[in-house]
From Swiss-Prot:
One of its GO terms (molecular function) is argininosuccinate synthase activity. Its EC number is 6.3.4.5. This is Argininosuccinate synthase. It is an enzyme of class 6 (ligase). Belongs to the argininosuccinate synthase family. Type 1 subfamily.
Length: 404
């Protein structure tokens, strides 16, 4: 092991990262700085301070990053209507670049020469943390204990705690799955969910009721957009993180946002994940609705063609890459006229667009009407349009080429 003087650890206060603190002190003979972020996971983060102090940590950073997370990461992603493999709203993926950024910034502030995280060697998070760190600080050293130690089970971790007098909560029995939450979503993986044929039990879901148990009366919301971002709900101005919190609550009550998928991880394996993203599900549907009347056709189609690549970059950990940054500039430029109001109806797991309006709308009812348009649209123009677009196919047919 190369010499490390000080390391900044992404610290949750849970079993894994508490063990990592002591393991780093013991195996690297270094000072450990802990960083705990509130990104809307719904748990108190302040108790992590006392836990870190008991482990001998002198420099402890606990920060509320909910607003930065929503404003600078979630909202920019939703301007692109981003989904991975047609379904996943990237709730875990989009949180990692912010944590990587703060790890590097704290390393700079404290003079640390390394960072560390609790991601395993099988998952995507190790890639996301480390790609971000190297992009922002090329010379930083990264310590990933799960790729080094032999503590390969919960039982071994608990034994290590007993041996090293680490106080952790010891829950009886094995957890049926692992959970990870932030402002945008909560995920469930592993354990009983590793069989893709087995339906997730109803009591697993934390943020939403089942569609069957949702109210029989629909809920209507009016979402106000400015430059592609929601700035108000039902006329009430809200900060980005407040928008997500409000939509999570009302969406969950109406059974919105559940997802059960098998996704392709960047590291090569297929993995089943169950997710609850009530607010994000509403945001995606509503954003597409406001774009439908404010975006030029070819610009909208260009965005749609680029979205899968943009989603893949985020999923794989390339948030800080030049290609993602370049795509973001195009996406943000496309949003300058995405202003207006979308009305949505939430009903038993469904998000139904019930109206959209904008002063920047490109929808012209004089042209679109099926009634007499007063000569605004000359239908005879369509003949030349059709003939020109058919020209290449007519030439091929004249040459005897089969179109079957």
């Amino acid at each position: 092991m190369s010499k490390v003087n000080k390391v900044v650890l992404a610290y949750s206060g849970g079993l894994d990262t508490s063990v990592i603190v002591k393991w780093l002190q013991e195996n690297y003979d270094c000072e450990v700085v802990t960083f705990t972020a509130d990104i809307g996971q719904g748990e108190e983060v302040e108790p992590a301070r006392a836990k870190a102090e008991k482990l001998g940590v002198k420099q402890i950073f606990i920060e509320d990053l909910r607003e930065e997370f929503a404003r600078d990461f979630v909202f920019p992603m939703f301007r692109a209507n981003t989904i991975y493999e047609g379904e996943y709203l990237l709730g875990t993926s989009i949180a990692r670049p912010l944590i990587a950024k703060r790890l590097v910034e704290i390393a700079n502030e404290t003079g640390a020469d390394a960072i560390s995280h609790g991601a395993t060697g099988k998952g995507n998070d190790q890639v996301r943390f480390e790609l971000g760190a190297y992009a922002l600080k090329p010379g930083i050293k990264v310590i990933a204990p799960w790729r080094e130690w032999d503590l390969t089970s919960r039982e071994k971790l608990l034994t290590y705690c007993d041996t090293h007098d680490i106080a952790v909560e010891k829950k009886k029995g094995k957890s049926p799955y692992s959970m990870d939450a932030n402002l945008l979503h909560i995920s469930y993986e592993g354990g009983i969910l590793e069989d893709p044929w087995e339906e997730a039990e109803e009591d697993m879901w934390r943020w939403s009721v089942s569609p069957e148990a949702a109210p029989d009366q629909a809920t209507y919301l009016e979402l106000t957009y400015q430059n592609g971002d929601i700035v108000a709900i039902d006329g009430e101005a809200l900060a980005p993180h407040e928008v997500i919190e409000r939509l999570n609550k009302v969406g969950g009550v109406n059974g919105v946002g559940r997802l059960d998928i098998v996704e392709n991880r960047y590291v090569g394996m297929k993995s089943r994940g169950c997710y609850e993203t009530p607010g994000g599900t509403i945001m995606l549907r509503a954003h597409r609705a406001i774009e439908s009347i404010t975006l030029d056709k070819e610009l909208a189609h260009l965005k749609d063609s680029l979205m899968p690549k943009y989603a893949e970059l985020i999923y794989n950990g390339y948030w800080w890459s030049p290609e993602r940054l370049a795509l973001q500039k195009l996406i943000d430029e496309s949003q300058q006229h995405v202003n207006g109001v979308v009305r949505v109806k939430l009903y038993k797991g469904n998000v139904i667009v019930a109206g959209r309006k904008s002063e920047d709308s490109l929808f012209d009812d004089r042209i679109a009407t099926f009634e007499d348009d007063g000569g605004v649209y000359n239908q005879r123009d369509a003949e030349g349009f059709i003939k020109l677009n058919a020209l290449r196919m007519r030439i091929a047919a004249d040459k005897g080429r089969s179109m079957k």
